[in-house]
Amino acid sequence: MKFKQDFFTQLPEFYSQVYPQGITKPEWLAWSDDAAQLIGLSQPTDELLLGLSGNAAVDGATYYAQVYSGHQFGGYTPRLGDGRSIILGEAIGPNGAWDVALKGGGPTPYSRRGDGRAVMRSAVREFLVSEALHHLHVPTTRALAVIGSDLPVWRESQETAAITVRLARSHIRFGHFEFFCHSERGRADKLIQLLNFTITQHYPHLSCDAAGYKAWFLQVVQDTAKMIAHWQAVGFAHGVMNTDNMSILGDSFDFGPFAFLDTFQEDFICNHSDPEGRYAFGQQPGVGLWNLQRLAQALTPVIPSDDLIAILNQYQEALVQTYLRLMRAKLGLSAVDVPSVEQDKQDLDLIGRFTVLMEKNQLDYTQTWRQLGKLDPTSKHSALRDDFIDVSQFDAWYQSYQQRLGAVADIPTWQTERNSVNPKYILRNYLAQEAIIAVEEGNLAPLHLLQKILTQPFAEHAEHEDLAKRPPDWGQGLIMSCSS
């Protein structure tokens, strides 16, 4: 890997230099060829294993942990920072630079009495979801590899340590800006320094002046809205949408007790530390705006409040238009009619009625959408009908759907198009758990198979139909913890 060190050299007050503590008996548990290409790597090597496990220096790496703050479950925590993630620098790839971070690399000045380690189960889950979201076309950070070890660590019980090698276009979070506004009061110079760095690195078409700052914040608002619209479309619940887990670039970031929906449930909670459902699936769009409002508060020394409010008011439109584009494609409505305010309203109603029917009939979200690929949209009798208990309500919806859809000249092509946007395979929690159990038993094959399938989620994979099934009784509604 070839590194540049722009963050390290230009923002010395934004991090602490710290070196990883190596894990014992490191081994490759998983590797992403796709992610490796981003930073010019090909195959995993023994030399790379030593470096990324913290047991040898990586040429050109500087090693540091960033400082930031954030709102966690609605309350402000003035000092957080990378408690178990150590960044090596920005690796230069064929199409840009990517931060390389060792998540689970050992304690840092921000570990807050923690051991700085990640356990194998959380490392595997983060690896799988990073790559799964990418191949579902959801903006996300990436995962290069998972490195296992025999190092014992204690959570609720004894587990083994592991490292996820994360790749990110940037690790700058909403919480970075909050830290230098609230926790370091009077440091508007540092806030401006961070803002100028972010624009120069990631928005080079913008200027570092008043007009550029407003244009940048609008881009952040729109990118955040688009990311969350993608989550809602694929049925993804993040679980811990604290502001310190929000990427300034609108990439899905910092995965813990996440889940994809099995049975559709608007108020689905995937995090057992969130009993009131602050971060429930259906709350995510509202939380996204709330988090942007907290970012806006941090930017008041730089951008006038009236301008910030005006820009925040554009969030809903960006969210709705992205969501409509994605959902119209899922339903096959993309090329039908010229969008208008009234058409948007009608389409949102059509989509909402369909998801309400899914919830009332306890249908699997992913499977129900996938069934559209078998549908003859010109037939009066839908193949979906048998899945619904309340057939009269379905019939009413289906009639509205056919009216909106209009004529379909080439049914096989229409069906193929539906299968190209409605995945057959998602990372169901029970599948991740089965892969983790197999790794604990020394069997990596289920993990590697699951990774392979998730990189082609729209393909049929007829020989692996079992990975598309609804969860068994023990795997339904699994709620994960933040323990990692």
From Swiss-Prot:
EC number: 2.7.7.-, 2.7.7.108
One Pfam entry name: SelO
Record flagged with keyword Nucleotide-binding: yes
Annotated keywords: ATP-binding, Magnesium, Manganese, Metal-binding, Nucleotide-binding, Nucleotidyltransferase, Transferase
Transmembrane region(s): none
One annotated GO molecular function: AMPylase activity
Keyword Disulfide bond (UniProt): no
Reported cofactor(s): Mg(2+); Mn(2+)
Binding site for Mg(2+): N245, D254
Active site: D244
Residue positions binding ATP: G81, G83, R84, K103, D115, G116, R166, R173, D254
Catalytic activity entry: L-seryl-[protein] + ATP = 3-O-(5'-adenylyl)-L-seryl-[protein] + diphosphate; L-threonyl-[protein] + ATP = 3-O-(5'-adenylyl)-L-threonyl-[protein] + diphosphate; L-tyrosyl-[protein] + ATP = O-(5'-adenylyl)-L-tyrosyl-[protein] + diphosphate; L-histidyl-[protein] + UTP = N(tele)-(5'-uridylyl)-L-histidyl-[protein] + diphosphate
Family label: Belongs to the SELO family.
Chain's role: Nucleotidyltransferase involved in the post-translational modification of proteins. It can catalyze the addition of adenosine monophosphate (AMP) or uridine monophosphate (UMP) to a protein, resulting in modifications known as AMPylation and UMPylation.
Name of the protein in its database record: Protein nucleotidyltransferase YdiU
Organism whose genome encodes this protein: Shewanella baltica (strain OS185)
Gene name in the database record: ydiU
